[in-house]
Amino acid sequence: QQCGRQASGRLCGNRLCCSQWGYCGSTASYCGAGCQSQCRS
């Protein structure tokens, strides 16, 4: 895991979203339901 509660609350670089599973990305599967940080509003 790269971010979120699975990685001690770490944020993703490049303003990427953190998925519910703790990985960084910019697609809907990262930024949509369950997104932990830097999500699209």
From Swiss-Prot:
Q: Which SUPFAM superfamilies does the annotation name?
A: Plant lectins/antimicrobial peptides
Q: Name one GO molecular function term.
A: chitin binding
Q: Where is the Chitin-binding type-1 domain?
A: 1-41
Instruction: State the Gene3D superfamilies in the record.
Output: Endochitinase-like
This chain's protein is named Antimicrobial protein PN-AMP1
CDD domains listed in its UniProt record = ChtBD1
Q: What does this protein do?
A: Chitin-binding protein with a defensive function against numerous chitin containing fungal pathogens. It is also an inhibitor of Gram-positive bacteria such as B.subtilis.
Q: Which residues carry this modification: Pyrrolidone carboxylic acid?
A: 1
Residue spans crossing the bilayer: none
Q: Which cysteines are joined by disulfide bonds?
A: 3-18, 12-24, 17-31, 35-39
Q: Which UniProt keywords apply?
A: Antibiotic, Antimicrobial, Chitin-binding, Disulfide bond, Fungicide, Plant defense, Pyrrolidone carboxylic acid
Give the source species: Ipomoea nil (Japanese morning glory)
